[in-house]
């Protein structure tokens, strides 16, 4: 009977130890996933800012190019 008690306690102890190790591992993985999510959100935010800045620059360059072309045409017509 004492042998069965010792065996049962040993099995329960080893089960608890392995369970706690798994929980710690899971918590570490969850923390890493949260950090990765935060970094990817920051990257997405930066990308959208860069994209918006690019769009604004493209609009400004189109306006400038249009004005330059209009000025060149006006000069060409003025010379004739």
Swiss-Prot record:
Pfam short name (any one): FSAP_sig_propep
Chain positions listed as propeptide in the UniProt record: 23-42, 79-80
Segments for region (Disordered): 24-48
GO biological process: one example: defense response to bacterium
Annotated Acidic residues bias: 29-40
Keywords for the protein's UniProt record, in alphabetical order: Amidation, Amphibian defense peptide, Antibiotic, Antimicrobial, Cleavage on pair of basic residues, Secreted, Signal
Broad class of the protein's primary localization: secreted
Keyword Repeat: no
Cellular component GO terms, alphabetical: extracellular region
Superkingdom as given in the UniProt entry: Eukaryota
Location(s), subcellular: Secreted
Record keyword Secreted present: yes
Range of residues in the leader sequence: 1-22
Expression sites (tissue/organ): Expressed by the skin glands.
Modified residues (Leucine amide): 77
Entry similarity comment: Belongs to the frog skin active peptide (FSAP) family. Dermaseptin subfamily.
Function: Possesses a potent antimicrobial activity against Gram-positive and Gram-negative bacteria. Probably acts by disturbing membrane functions with its amphipathic structure.
Name of the protein: Dermaseptin-DA3
Species: Agalychnis dacnicolor (Giant Mexican leaf frog)
């Amino acid at each position: 009977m004492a042998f069965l008690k010792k065996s049962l306690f040993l099995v329960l102890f080893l089960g608890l130890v392995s369970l706690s190790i798994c929980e710690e591992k899971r918590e570490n993985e969850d923390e890493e996933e949260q950090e990765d999510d935060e970094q990817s959100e920051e990257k997405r935010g930066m990308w959208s800012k860069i994209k918006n800045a690019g769009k604004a620059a493209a609009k400004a360059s189109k306006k400038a190019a249009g004005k330059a072309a209009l000025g060149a045409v006006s000069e060409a017509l003025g010379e004739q």
